[in-house]
Amino acid sequence: MLEIKNVSKTFNPGTVNAKTALNGLNLTLNDGDFVTVIGGNGAGKSTMLNAVAGTIQVDTGSIILDGRDITRLPEFKRAAYLGRVFQDPMMGTAATMQIEENLALADRRGKRRTLHPGITQADRERYIEQLKILDLGLENRMTAKVGLLSGGQRQALTLLMATLQKPKLLLDEHTAALDPQTAQRVMDITDRLVRENHLTTLMITHNMRDAIHYGNRLLMLHNGRIVLDISGEEKARLTVPDLLALFSKVSGQEYDNDRALLA
């Protein structure tokens, strides 16, 4: 379970550039929840993920992960419990290392460092089986340098690496930099990995169709607060025009992202 309790964060406090990104945010994710998150620019979406990941420290409130208060836990210590995939496909992998070496690094994240004989044959066989899930042929290119892969292949590999330890998963617009066809494929892989591994997931997206189609719950943020929280049959019946109308109703504004309108 992941709980965000009355969390607030203001950047540049006490200056003319002060910006309240999170304003008493409250959110509870039960185990296995796949929650999609939308909102206009500056709504607080990425700040929320950064707060959970420990990239930033919150001003007030607390963050509880599986009953443990991690509010002040350093980012590197949270890595054992959290997997994150960013928008840029180049960020999650080491380009000069082989595919199997990248997987081995991810496999050992958060584990105690010991002397061992590198990648064992058992490791290699396990990685091959994991790569087959992607259906991209990467299981036949284990020793290829990751820098030779396409953006979509690298993002799919990053996603697999992020889920090896069965963590809570944070997805920060992880398909936004991909072409539509590749983005759809990565989203299908995402859905499969989340479902098969029963991963608790927070996914930010500007694609309203994806926000509606994937996951069991949909949140909309506005001015650092959750203004919509939709699940079940209500979510299943939603259309993009419905969602745009709901946003206008609760926020008093038009949704300000062209990608959402074109999705």
Report the location of each language-model feature:
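A short, flexible loop at the N-terminus of ABC-type nucleotide-binding domains that lies
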Residues: 1, 10-24, 74
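Conserved beta-strand-loop-alpha-helix hinge in the C-terminal portion
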Residues: 225-251
